[in-house]
Amino acid sequence: MQHKGKVAKRSVTSTWMLSLFLASLCSIVTYLAGIGIASAAASKAYGKPGDPIDLVIGYQPYYTESWSGLIMRDKKFYEKYLPKGSTVTFQIGLQGAIIVNGMLAGKIDVGYVGDMPGIASTSHPEVRDVRIVSVLGLGLDQCNIFLVRPDAPQFATPDEGLKWLDGKIVAVPKGSCTDRFAQAVFKERAIKPSEYLNQSIEVITSGLRAGKLDAAVIWEPTASRLVQEGIARRVASGASVNERDGGFMVMPQALIEQRPDVVKAWLEAELDAVLYFADAKNAMDVAKMAAGQTTGFTEKALWASAFGATPKSEGGTDTRITLPYGFTPDAMELIQKASKFLVEMKSIPSEIRPEAIVPQFTADILKAHGLTAPVGEVKALPPEMYTGK
C-alpha cells in the first residue's frame, strides 16, 4: 500500500477564505451548467474486483463533523482492507462544494462532505451519478452555532440570545448548512433581522471584529476559533431549538457498481476511524492530527471544536457529535429536511432520489461486527481535559 499526496499548508489569507466562500453550493450549479453531459456522464473505469486501485479522497479538515477523514489520512486504516498495491491520495476541500465538483468531474472517488453539498451531489445523475453511502456525523452544535459580537448583552438563556437577534444585522454563507439552520430558527421564532447578509467567513470575521455585524451563524472549527480569539461569543445552537446538522460520505455509482469490494474495504476502514474518534482517550491525538492538516487554527481551538464543553446557557451539549455510520432515523430526517430546503433555494431541481441513499454496505458491515447505528459519540469534555500548549 502506498500513500501519496502530502497536504500542502497554506497561509490563511483573503485568497484562502474567498475560495471557501466561492465554493458554495452555487458553484455546483454553475459547474453543472457548464460541462457537457456526454463527457461528464462517461463512467470512470475502476478495474475488476480484487485489482489494485488508485483512489483520490476529498476530505474537509476545516469541518469538524467530518473529521473521520483526517483520522483516516493519519492512521491509514484503509491499508488493512484495500487490495495490495492500491494507492490513496488525499485532497483537502476547503468546502464540500469543491469536493463535489471534483467528484462530478471524475477526479475524486470518495468524498467527506457536509449535509448540503452531500445532498446536492446526488441531484444530477445525468452528469455523474453520486450516492450517499455513510453518515459521518450528526450534531446539534457543529454547523448550527449562533455567534454574536463580543460587546452584545449577556444572556441568561439561548432563548434570550435568539430574541435579541430580531432587528439585528446577521450574516451567513448562504446556501450552507448555517443558512438552512438560521432560516429555520428565524421562521420558528418569528425573528426578523434588519439585514440577512450573504458573507464569507473572512468577511464575517472582519465584520464582527469591527462591530459591523451583530451576529453570524458559523460551523466548527471556525466557531471555536472566533470565540477563543475574543472576536465573538456563542449564544445558541441547534440544541436550543432541536435542529440537527450532519456530514456524509459520497461515492460515484460507477465505483459502487464496478468495485463493491473497494466500497466495502473503505467503509470497513471508516468504521475503524469512527470508533477511534469516539474514544475520549484519543481526543488529544485527534486534535494534533487536525493541527497538522490545517492552518490558521490553534490546537486548542481545534480540540474545543470537537471535544470542548460549552455552557448550556450558550447552547452547549453533552454530546458534540453522534457517529451514526449507518442511516439512522435521525440521519434520514435530516436528509429529507435539507433536501426540501435545497429545492426551495432552487439549488437542486427536486428532492433527493430514494436510490441516492445506499445503506446496504454499512448495514452489512455493522451486522458482521455485531454493532448497531449509531456506533459511538464524541462526548463534550471539560476544558481541563485539554493537555496541550
Model-derived features with residue positions:
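Secondary-structure end/capping motifs
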Residues: 258-350
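Short, low-complexity disordered leader/linker segments with a strong preference
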Residues: 1-54, 372-389
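Sec-exported extracytoplasmic/periplasmic mature domains
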Residues: 73, 77, 83, 104-108, ...
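Conserved C-terminal helix/tail region of periplasmic/extracytoplasmic solute-binding proteins
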Residues: 335-389
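Short, glycine-/small- and polar/acidic-enriched structural segments
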Residues: 41-190, 195-199, 214-217, 243, ...
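Extracytoplasmic/secreted envelope proteins and their assembly/folding machinery
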Residues: 75, 100, 104, 115-118, ...
